[in-house]
Structure formats: structure tokens, C-alpha cells
């Protein structure tokens, strides 16, 4: 008679869903007002001119134009701006 000892239970086997974070519009790309530029946790990128920040730190365009990434300030922070034509 074929028998098999009962397997032990495991406490693994779970993983969280991907949150789809990151840069959505890159430097030089044209955007319309309201377009999401960066989805992030915390302020990896800071809002520059013509860019707003949502309550989950999402950066979005407040005017039509081209995306510009720049490093500014004493602390070398990364800023995202929209350059209007």
C-alpha cells in the first residue's frame, strides 16, 4: 500500500502587488496640464515650476509644455519642471 507522510504547512507564499511607481514622462517629452510625470513614495523628485504634488507625492503637470529634470540646490535635489513654449 503506497503511503506518504503528511507534508508540513508553510508560512510563505505571499507577495504584494506591484505599485507601478516610477517616471511616466521623461525629459523633453511634451505633456498636457494634469498629466502624471512621476509616481513615487516620498519625495525622490521635487516639484519645480508648473508642477504640482498630490497627497501621495505624485508629481503632475499644471501647464502644457515640455518636461525638464534638473539637479538644484545645496542638497543636490532632483527637481521636475515644465517648460512652457
From Swiss-Prot:
Listed Pfam families: Ribosomal_L27
Residue ranges of the region described as Disordered: 1-20
A biological process from GO: translation
Single GO term (MF): structural constituent of ribosome
Keyword Ribosomal protein attached: yes
A GO CC term assigned to this protein in UniProt: cytosolic large ribosomal subunit
InterPro entries: Ribosomal_bL27, Ribosomal_bL27_CS
Keyword Aminoacyl-tRNA synthetase attributed: no
Domain of life: Bacteria
Keywords recorded for this protein, A-Z: Ribonucleoprotein, Ribosomal protein
Protein family per UniProt: Belongs to the bacterial ribosomal protein bL27 family.
Protein name from the UniProt record: Large ribosomal subunit protein bL27
UniProt source species: Actinobacillus succinogenes (strain ATCC 55618 / DSM 22257 / CCUG 43843 / 130Z)
Highest classification ranks of the organism: Bacteria, Pseudomonadati, Pseudomonadota, Gammaproteobacteria, Pasteurellales
Amino acid at each position: 500500500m503506497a503511503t506518504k507522510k503528511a507534508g508540513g504547512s508553510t508560512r510563505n507564499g505571499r507577495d504584494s502587488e506591484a505599485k507601478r511607481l516610477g517616471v511616466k514622462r521623461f525629459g523633453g517629452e511634451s505633456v498636457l496640464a494634469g498629466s502624471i510625470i512621476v509616481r513615487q513614495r516620498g519625495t525622490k523628485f521635487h516639484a519645480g515650476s508648473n508642477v504640482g504634488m498630490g497627497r501621495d507625492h505624485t508629481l503632475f503637470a499644471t501647464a502644457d509644455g515640455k518636461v525638464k529634470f534638473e539637479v538644484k540646490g545645496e542638497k543636490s535635489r532632483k527637481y521636475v519642471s515644465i517648460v512652457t513654449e
